[in-house]
Amino acid sequence: MTLYICGNSHTRALRAGASALEQEEGADPMVVFPLGTADNEAEPFSAIEDGKVVLTNRRFRKKLKQFFDVSAFEPEHRWGICLGNHNYRIFRHEGWLDAAPSWLGVAGKTPVSEDLFARIVAEDQQHIRAFFDQLISTGVRPFVISAPWPVRPDPETTELKLPLTMLKSIDTRARVLFADWLSKRGIAIVTPPVETADEDGFLKPDYAKGGDDPYHGNNTYGRLMMRKVLAHEAKVAPLKPVARQA
């Protein structure tokens, strides 16, 4: 079965990692390409048409056809989807200037209960979750490839200066909620390699793209992540070699 991997811009590091593993270790060829950036997740981007899931976002739809030569997601393909756990929209919301998760017990801040926080996460992920529900309902059984750990914010350039413990707690709880939601639907998630996180749970500089990019992992990170993806897939879905697209 062919392994196709697509998703948001975090897929770029995965593509570099897949290419390195093919060249250096003889891994079976895969088709790995990003569809677009994570800001596209804030609006509906998929629908069911004629019993198949299609992408309604114009950029996503164009990339799917260009790089995967398909117009819809079908059960005969094995899909790894890199969507979810890009939690920057959540923990960079200005509402956290006056509020804090209730489980942290921060004095002087309006407590956000666990139930309310779960609703915040569900609202942020609503279109991603709708996409996965659509895939399942049409017989496609995807797995999820998580976004990397968050990059430690630069205090000189970050506008919303939250305590690091609070920022990381928000991210961690959001990841747990997403994993639980996926688990209830029988969807596996491949999480970032533990060795890529520092002692506070942020992406180590050695694995971050760096420069003016505050979000993404680098090619070294992508290589480690793709090795973990292939280890996961070796247990559940034998791969069928395909011609790599230019």
Label each region the model flagged.
Residues 67-118:
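Oxyanion-hole/transition-state-stabilizing segment in secreted/luminal serine hydrolases
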Residues 57-67, 114-132, 164-178, 222:
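Well-ordered, non-membrane alpha-helical segments in soluble/globular domains
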Residues 129-168:
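Active-site segments of SGNH/GDSL-like serine hydrolases
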Residues 144-148, 184-203, 207, 240-244:
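Acidic carboxylate-rich catalytic motifs and surrounding loops in phosphoryl-/glycosyl-chemistry enzymes
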Residues 12-15, 41-43, 87-92, 150-156, ...:
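Short catalytic/ligand-binding loop motif for oxyanion handling, primarily in non-cytosolic enzymes
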Residues 152-191:
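Substrate-gating cap/lid alpha-helix
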Residues 206-246:
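Histidine-centered active-site loop/cap adjacent to the catalytic His
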Residues 1-77, 232-233, 238-246:
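Basic, amphipathic N-terminal segments that precede the first structured/catalytic domain
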